[in-house]
UniProtKB/Swiss-Prot annotation:
This is Phosphatidylethanolamine N-methyltransferase. The keyword DNA damage does not apply. PROSITE patterns: SAM_CHO2. It is found in: Endoplasmic reticulum membrane. Residues 11-20 have a biased composition (Basic and acidic residues). Residues 342-355 have a biased composition (Polar residues). Catalyzes the first step of the methylation pathway of phosphatidylcholine biosynthesis, the SAM-dependent methylation of phosphatidylethanolamine (PE) to phosphatidylmonomethylethanolamine (PMME). InterPro entries: Phopholipid_MeTrfase, Phosphatid-EA_MeTrfase_fun. Pathway: Phospholipid metabolism; phosphatidylcholine biosynthesis. Belongs to the class VI-like SAM-binding methyltransferase superfamily. CHO2 family. It catalyses: a 1,2-diacyl-sn-glycero-3-phosphoethanolamine + S-adenosyl-L-methionine = a 1,2-diacyl-sn-glycero-3-phospho-N-methylethanolamine + S-adenosyl-L-homocysteine + H(+). It holds the Pfam family PEMT.
Amino acid sequence: MDRGLSTGAHQGDDGLRERTVASQSSSAPGLEALTATGEGEVKDKAGKGKKTYGRTPGGKVFTVPQTHDMVSQLLSPSEPKNLSDIIVLVILAAHILLLWRLPAGAKVPVFAFIYLFWRGAYNAGIGWLLHNQSNHRTLVRWAEKTKIFVNPATGQNSHANLYKLIKRELKTKIPADYSFEDAPIEYNTWLVFRRLVDLILMCDFTSYCLFAIACSQRPLDEGTLMTALRWSAGIILVLFNLWVKLDAHRVVKDYAWYWGDFFFLIDQELTFDGVFEMAPHPMYSVGYAGYYGISLMAASYKVLFISILAHAAQFAFLVFVENPHIEKTYNPPPPRKRTIDQENVSITPQRSDSPSAPAPLDEQVPHAPSYSSGPPPSVHNLLGFRNLDLYRTIDTSSILIQFLVFALTVLTPSTPWFQFLFVANAAVWRIWYSVGIGLVLDRQSNCKAWTRHFVKYGESPQEAWNQWKGTYHISMVMCYASFIAAVWKMYSFPADWGYGLVLLRHVLGAGLIALQIWTSVSIYESLGEFGWFYGDFFFDESPKLTYDGIYRFLNNPERVLGLAGVWGAVLITSSGAVTFLALMSHILSLGFIQFVERPHMQKLYGRSLRRDAGLTKSLKRSLPPSLQQLHGSVDKIFDESFEFIEELIDTARPKLAAGVNTFVKDTSALFQKYPARVTISRIDEDLAGYDSRDYSLEVEGTDSLSPNDNDQSGREGANARMPLDRRGDLKNLVFEYGSPIKVKWTAPLNHSKKDWIGLYRVTDNTSREVTRVSSQGRWIAVNEGSYDNLTCEKGIVSSDILIPASQRKDNENRDLASGEVIFSGDKLFWTQGVFEFRYHHNGKHNVMAISRPFEIRISRFDEDEIPLMDPTSVELSLFPVVRNCFDRDPQIAPETVDEPFGSLVERDGRYAKRIVFAVHQMFGIEFAPEVVKADGNVHNLARRICNAKRVLAPYSLTKNGATTPTEGKE
């Protein structure tokens, strides 16, 4: 419902800390710009309303009639009512009646269960339906299979009464511009889906309110003033929630409210205003403020906790259902660049700042280095658990330092002396993190002091950048580790959780901590590694501001939200010392923004900075003119005050800079399978009449270049060294890694339309009659339209082609049906091994035929023939493997060794992982997937392989020293 979709792009003109995002395409605004799929009318030049047009996935264009929201349809007397409305109203009335009739002791548990049921139906039920509709068009396929929208007069629909009921229900709700018979099946399916959504959403909200009523109470020791304040705050939150819902519906209309883009798209101009300028995904974030308002009015922790649970479930719905669909629908990867700028290639065939493999060692000659002004490619990121690398000094140092800090925290007593030490330590680190780092960045902004220091000793700007990232990372880790340690020392476990506001303080504190974590993650997602570490202080090439993610709504999210967690710690501890640390942290953070970030951003971006973010604009528009003028006067006072402080600091800056410079010179820096699934084998008892001799599977694929590698290594006995004696002309099937595999099948003419073919390892199944291992998505149906998803039909080439009995090789006199399917991409095993295909009966796991076993093998590069690792030879060997790893998709697979990879490689890590596995098997070199993304084409990757082989040659265990320490040929 929320969709979070009307967060579209708007042209900004100011903002801080929204830095240049290196190595990111400008496609990000495309996601935001196209995700507000409101159903407002497209208007002509005269301003007259025009019709809205929709487009189905098949390309059919139709008129989208005007519809109304569910509350108006159900409760407004002016709206026509039908059977489904009456059913919903009766169910709602039953909920209210149940609350009235239940005994007092049963109301709370019963309505807690009822609400959790409807909340599960919303987030899990509707989420499952939408997920399958997005990926497999499941709801539309159900409608196609049951033919419920087909006129029974045609003889194709046997449910005449159901057809009449649905037709009457839909036409009653949409009297104009709607024809049930002519509307696309996608639109009719969406209308039926809406009725289910109406039922679930109305019951969800009603049961929540009834649960709150059942839990409502007034604390015994609460005064009249506190009661009035509690109810006033609750009512304000509920009214704010109501405004958010109404304004969001005004913008997105019913189309996005009911997830219409899961079924079809509409052609119209997009509008971005109101609540969608205030917060990301407002219906799922600030749109749940009313839940906490109701919790306040009910004065019940039960209502508060169930509200938090519901809010968390709604965010899970957003993350796992809506966001993947939005990304797929509105932000597809840009097409791959098929041509290369020949002029640039001829002049500078290998730019120094391009993400390419390093030059061979023997080609390097002493000369003055030329430094690139552009940022280095981001290959090995620093932040995040997935980027943790214990071989990297900064990561190991961070872990060791944190371990020592927390060990000291736990092992030392919480006496006043130790509490003072830990608070002082946290204060020192906060001062360094804000003031010390701020001075370093200020000197870097004005005179490139940090970079000059490393260039002075012959290092590159990239090395200065890497060292800076380590320094900043350690400082940030120690700042927060020391703060957490101080909080731990000042915290005392409550003796009575029910006393006063103890429990509420802990809940609010945990919420603020979660808010800071979410803010930090959002900032990192928007800025990337480059912006997080203030990359535009170090590299000035082509500065460009981007306002997306959290920066669409706030210029400086770290100004308030970025420090919410420290105030959460204040609430939890109720300690004066922690309050002092939080206040100091906030003041220093504001000073850092004002005196370090703002001057640099103004110098670098000038007038391209916007003055007001989306939230600020919305709040200003809501103020009366007199208050807007007052706001401007206050801003002027603050600006003048900050200018005075800046002048004061400028006067004292030389002395401070000299001290910091001495300190820097005299100090040296220190320091993911799918969960196992229980698979129940489904055995069909109705196998009578099917002859297994009528079923067969024949496999065809691209033969491996060296299918006989290592067949005879000299380790065998005398008899085993003799040439292989084959009885027949069948040879071993050995296919290339990742190449598509064609499977030809035969079956009786009366075979089940739900038959399917699966791919398995030969060792996975001990039974030849029943498959007891999950295919994990590696299966294809033999007929189209038999299953409720489209994925299983990808790969079908032909079905039910008649083979006369005269053409059978086994001399049987029965005709057969035949077909072809092609397994490719995700339907293959991306590893080496021996595999087989199995033909299964009627959607179950009964095996009717098994193919010949075949091997998937990656041919090892023959270094004896080319001992010098010629890059051209490596390119020729690597190129077909890379194309296979990219599923031979023209959008991402290159046509030549110099063509760049498609942009999807940057988003989906599986492609790069396939390549690094193949490289490891072919050349004995292990790369990280990020290397493939950074190199960008086969040519650069081949050069990197050659260089790596040369570098590691001295450590080789083979005779000629041409390979790395791996299992070599003997």
